[in-house]
Amino acid sequence: MIPQRIKELEAYKTEVTPASVRLSSNEFPYDFPEEIKQRALEELKKVPLNKYPDPEAKELKAVLADFFGVKEENLVLGNGSDELIYYLSIAIGELYIPVYIPVPTFPMYEISAKVLGRPLVKVQLDENFDIDLERSIELIEKEKPVLGYFAYPNNPTGNLFSRGKIEEIRNRGVFCVIDEAYYHYSGETFLEDALKREDTVVLRTLSKIGMASLRVGILIGKGEIVSEINKVRLPFNVTYPSQVMAKVLLTEGREFLMEKIQEVVKERERMYDEMKKIEGVEVFPSKANFLLFRTPYPAHEVYQELLKRDVLVRNVSYMEGLQKCLRVSVGKPEENNKFLEALEESIKSLSSSL
């Protein structure tokens, strides 16, 4: 029998609507140069497809440890960060003890808890999209959650939560998962805490820096925590092709990546400045590779107007506190220009129809 908690869930939906400018999934806008991809494919040809992959992904771990400036024993790898979020929801605290989540945020935190039947302590962000510390402390003292998820920067709002507020919550016995999926666009991290403390881990991913198709997520933590999380990790969870290709792309493509990441940051700031000039658009500062914006019009109408102009963004107005809001990923300059033009036209079209 399917339990009621599963029946009440909805399958996670990804955006598959066709458009020539797709700025809805926070993907890295640049593919690797052909010569680097060719090197990765050469290594891929050597993979024995009839054999299971290295269950510990030792060679990839060595490259990732160097890339992030940590030791191999501080790493757990997953089939994307989503898998690691599930492992943390399984391993940290008894399943009847609540999970703390500031909202709106990345949906997988809530989904992983609900799948396991874990109670939730959800606290709405304040008007600046920061943690409402007073309300959080009130509910933490009452409900006693032992696990908390913090997207840093937060998705979909793009801002960094106040570090001191996260530390205050941690001081009240909440194990803190700091999801740094967008670390390369903010430069802010809890990595030092994760390496020294047993109540903090950091999540990173290769998906936001050009390797989304490989599905490689990284948990960074103290050795004792890593050992416990590994007990619930599924065997052979990172495929051989992903291990081999990520290793090549991170070593031979590192200079390319760092250069293009800076281009994305530069484009983000340009988009922010240009969006502020469009009458009726309120755009919020971001430390990620996307921007949240609000208009006076229903979000689904703005979404459709943009789609008419062959531009796809994400409608996030269904999320707590984000009425009339949409999220746009930072693309290549020419894609961003097309979005900016389409947004201005869309707003004019909607205003003239009133």
UniProtKB/Swiss-Prot annotation:
Xref: PANTHER family: HISTIDINOL-PHOSPHATE AMINOTRANSFERASE, HISTIDINOL-PHOSPHATE AMINOTRANSFERASE 2
Record note on quaternary structure: Homodimer.
Catalytic activities: L-histidinol phosphate + 2-oxoglutarate = 3-(imidazol-4-yl)-2-oxopropyl phosphate + L-glutamate
Cofactor(s) demanded: pyridoxal 5'-phosphate
GO process annotations (BP): L-histidine biosynthetic process
Pathway field: Amino-acid biosynthesis; L-histidine biosynthesis; L-histidine from 5-phospho-alpha-D-ribose 1-diphosphate: step 7/9
EC number(s) given by UniProt: 2.6.1.9
Keyword Transferase: yes
Superkingdom assignment: Bacteria
PTM-bearing positions, type N6-(pyridoxal phosphate)lysine: 208
Record family assignment: Belongs to the class-II pyridoxal-phosphate-dependent aminotransferase family. Histidinol-phosphate aminotransferase subfamily.
Keywords: Amino-acid biosynthesis, Aminotransferase, Histidine biosynthesis, Pyridoxal phosphate, Transferase
NCBIfam families in the record: hisC (TIGR01141)
Protein name: Histidinol-phosphate aminotransferase
Enzyme category, top tier: transferase
Keyword Ribonucleoprotein recorded: no
Parts of the chain that traverse the membrane: none
InterPro entries for the chain: Aminotransferase_I/II_large (IPR004839), HisP_aminotrans (IPR005861), HistidinolP_aminotransfase (IPR050106), PyrdxlP-dep_Trfase (IPR015424), PyrdxlP-dep_Trfase_major (IPR015421), PyrdxlP-dep_Trfase_small (IPR015422)
